[in-house]
Regions:
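Flexible, glycine-rich active-site loops centered on histidine and acidic residues
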Residues: 275-310
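Short acidic, glycine/serine/threonine-rich loops at helix termini
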Residues: 229-232, 264-267, 292-298, 380-383, ...
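Acidic, glycine-rich active-site loops and adjacent beta-strand->loop/helix elements
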Residues: 221-226, 257-262, 285-291, 455-460
Length: 512
């Protein structure tokens, strides 16, 4: 039997000061052009927390709106706030920056995150009201230290500053004098990713109703890497996040594949469960501070707010078949192989058409495709176009090429089988994963039967190969008893018969 998707959680962290101080577009600009007009104008384009919460794609990400409802809104969305928008959503929340800095400290096992005493005193009462973090996490927040000590660490000791509302409120210290892999900059990135994964895991426990000790394995699939100079990406971020999230009975490991990593991780998790190795596997990823404000130059130049101001995170729970939740069908897995090639048509053929043909299915047998769900509000002003729509056009074009669809039906195909994008451009975050929760619910509600989750990644960014990458799988309605009949087991009588026959054959061979 296949494994099933039992629950999903999605979280965002509003991080406006991290946009300014930690996003690589901004840190690079301060090196090459420190007096640029862009850096001067940037603060005027930063959104408030309330504005980020009321942003329709963000409300969609945490489950307060569906992709269909977002698609009914006229674009662009940045100047159309959602009335009555809330921090909490069906699948998670949008955490404010000040609370997240305390969560980063709680996620730090080596006393690297230091926070201002007054800032902690002001912020901790708000975090104590969080319904999902628990005293075991809150107890890890320290009382704080003097502002003068914080300023000295940043100005004289190579520490990386932590800011809120434009004010220095803490720092991340380096963990080694000469090891660049343990620099304050790298540790800040890793701790932010870890803390956002912790938040996603805590929400997953809530949405699933599963006890922390029931989760046996965690796969982390972000784009960060932790290690020292002797093993730069040694890991293990999965186990590190599981520790803080309270998953005391879990082990785990990391999966990397740029933007395709989540889909690789989902397939691996489903395989581990189907094989019986583990009963409950969580897949999670935190956000990327480096990508904050990645396209902000274009946004600022065009008079738009900086829309890449949130860290993204998610977690999904994959368990043994319960006869109810949607199956992850491992008989329909698309893969971009070494020999596939990198043309868009070759990529989509390998990920969509080929696995469906092997399963005796057609493209239009899939109700919804989820691929590269980047928010077009972000990508279109930056010149990258509408990325999800480009994917759905290519899939529709394949349907035309194979004779499934008339050319005149292409737009209708995109509307019926595609969707708008809503995910922040956090690399691994948009790549199919944000639709998992919505797909599960739509299948349970009888609104559809099959969705294909598509992960795509650009491996050339690591400068080790020019290869593209991708993997896909189908999430489908649970077939329950019907599947049992199609996959019968072997009865005890049949086993006894086979043993008896084997013994007779062995005896005959001995006589000869």
């Amino acid at each position: 039997m296949n494994s099933v998707l039992t629950a999903a959680s999605y979280i965002l962290v509003h991080a406006p000061d991290m946009v300014v101080h930690n996003g690589t577009t901004q840190t690079t600009e301060r090196v090459v052009n420190p007096g640029s007009e862009y850096l001067k104008q940037l603060p005027e384009h930063i959104r408030s927390y309330d504005q980020a919460v009321a942003y329709a794609p963000n409300q969609t990400y945490i489950g307060n709106m569906t992709p269909g409802q977002l698609g009914e809104m006229e674009q662009p969305w940045h100047d159309m706030p959602v009335a009555g928008a809330t921090r909490e959503g069906r699948y998670g929340e949008i955490m404010p920056q000040d609370e997240f800095l305390l969560l980063m400290q709680a996620s730090d096992m080596f006393d690297l995150v230091r926070l201002d005493r007054a800032f902690v005193a002001k912020t901790k009462p708000a975090l104590e009201k969080h319904p999902l973090l628990g005293q075991e996490i809150l107890a890890l927040v320290k009382a704080g230290e003097d502002a003068s000590d914080i300023a000295r660490a940043v100005n004289e000791e190579h520490a990386e500053g932590l800011y809120h509302m434009g004010q220095l409120v803490g720092y991340v210290k380096r963990a080694h004098d000469v090891d660049a892999n343990l620099s304050a900059h790298v540790l800040l990135e890793n701790l932010a990713s870890k803390a956002s994964a912790v938040l996603a895991l805590r929400h997953l426990l809530h949405t699933s109703g599963v006890a922390p000790e029931e989760i046996e394995y965690v796969i982390e699939c972000s784009e960060e890497a932790c290690g020292d100079m002797n093993q730069r990406g040694g890991g293990n971020m999965a186990k590190a996040a599981a520790e803080v999230a309270g998953l005391g009975n879990a082990t785990g490991s990391d999966v990397r594949g740029f933007c395709a990593a989540p889909s690789h991780a989902f397939v691996m998790a489903a395989s581990l469960v189907k094989a019986g190795t583990f009963k409950k596997v969580a897949v999670t990823a935190g956000g990327s501070t480096a990508k904050l404000g990645m396209n902000a130059k274009d946004h600022v130049r065009k008079g738009l707010p900086v829309l890449e101001d949130v860290l993204g995170g998610f977690a999904v729970l994959i368990t043994a078949d319960d006869g109810k939740n949607p199956e992850i069908d491992l008989d329909i897995v698309g893969r971009h192989t070494v020999g596939t090639g990198a043309s868009p048509q070759a990529v989509i053929t390998s990920l969509v058409l080929s696995p469906l043909e092997r399963a005796g299915m057609k493209i239009q047998d899939i109700d919804k495709f989820a691929a590269e769900l980047q928010n077009p509000d972000i990508t279109k002003p930056a010149g990258a176009g509408d990325v999800p729509q480009a994917n759905f056009k290519m899939i529709g074009a394949l349907a035309v090429k194979t004779g499934e669809l008339d050319r005149g039906g292409l737009n209708g195909f995109i509307e019926q089988h595609g969707m708008v994008g809503w995910a922040p451009t956090q690399g691994h975050i948009p790549s199919g994963a944000p639709y998992m929760g919505f797909a599960r619910q739509a299948i349970l509600d009888g609104e559809m039967e099959k969705a294909m989750i598509i992960g795509k990644g650009s491996l050339f960014l690591g400068r080790l190969t020019n290869q593209f990458d991708g993997i896909s799988f189908v999430l489908r309605k649970n077939r329950g008893a019907a599947q049992q009949q199609q996959e019968p087991g072997i009865s005890k009588e049949e086993v006894r018969g086979m043993i008896a026959e084997a013994l007779r054959s062995f005896a005959a061979s001995m006589e000869g």
